[in-house]
Amino acid sequence: MKTYTAKPAEIEKKWILIDAEGVVLGRLASIVAMRLRGKHKPTFTPHMDMGDNVIIINADKVQMTGDKRDAKKYYWHTGHPGGIKHRTARQVLEGAHPERVVIKAVERMISRNKLGKQQMTNLRVYAGAEHPHEAQQPEVLDVKSMNAKNTRSA
């Protein structure tokens, strides 16, 4: 029997809505990365963009375990000598773009190549509860009820 390979016409993409309020960041990112790659589908083909379109709301209310909110640092370099910079997760979450914490966590769980970049375009993250994708009729994925460890209280 030959190995099944999906054809572009057979790929069916759904829209998934996830509420990140109170959900542990790493567990959320792992589930989202799996959905973006399409590994939850029985027709998964590694070299094709099979994943769903994922919308994450309330990204500013995501939780972290331990002291990661203060200890975890996001580094970047300005390109100038001695230009290494960093911000803690707390500074990013309280800043102008708190959704970047979730985007970066998911981005680091997706492969770093052309396919990975294509899959990341299917992710939309919003800091608040509002999103402009009602016309796509996304189905809600309740990450909190999947496992008791997926949530933390403040």
From Swiss-Prot:
Belongs to the universal ribosomal protein uL13 family. PANTHER family: LARGE RIBOSOMAL SUBUNIT PROTEIN UL13M, RIBOSOMAL PROTEIN L13. Keywords: Ribonucleoprotein, Ribosomal protein. The lineage of its organism: Bacteria, Pseudomonadati, Pseudomonadota, Alphaproteobacteria, Rhodobacterales. NCBIfam families: rplM_bact. One of its GO terms (cellular component) is cytosolic large ribosomal subunit. Residues 132-154 are annotated as: Disordered. Part of the 50S ribosomal subunit. This is Large ribosomal subunit protein uL13. InterPro entries: Ribosomal_uL13, Ribosomal_uL13_bac-type, Ribosomal_uL13_sf. GO terms for biological process: negative regulation of translation; translation. Pfam families: Ribosomal_L13. This protein is one of the early assembly proteins of the 50S ribosomal subunit, although it is not seen to bind rRNA by itself. It is important during the early stages of 50S assembly. One of its GO terms (molecular function) is structural constituent of ribosome. Transmembrane segments: none annotated. It comes from Paracoccus denitrificans (strain Pd 1222).
